Amino acid sequence: MNNGQICHCGKTGCLETAASGSAAHRVVLEKLKEGHASLLSEKFKSGSDITLEDILDAAHEEDVLAIEAIEEVGTNLGRAIAGLINIFNPELVIIGGCVSSAQDYILLPIKIAVQKHSLSLINRDTKIKISKLGGKAGSIGACMLSRSKLLGLL
């Protein structure tokens, strides 16, 4: 990603700066500063913090700015997934994390970008789905890993 954004790790070019909840948050705040209309405008003008949950709620209420920010993140994520599909040819890609609660608002741009940027012979068999675990996937995975180590399964 060549967006010039500095990641929280201190480097530039990280996928997280363009394809994450924090990226959607940054895009929305930038557009609100430019004066774009949104359901979030009043909250922004009052100086209240806008959270990712606020953005996702606004998207579910058909807020154009929130939807565009999520679509931008989805497109960037789809481009990255396309590269991984070209290399690994997975049968299934599961989208998790808090942004996954955007459902079709993020899934459609991901699928479009994957179709555009991956080899059609390879991506034909790959399914892309939203995790049923949502934002809890990482926590559940960490618990399962700890459990497996504790029980000596790993």
Explain the meaning of each model-derived region.
Residues 3-6, 11-154:
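ATP-binding/phosphotransfer module of carbohydrate and carboxylate kinases, centering on a glycine-rich
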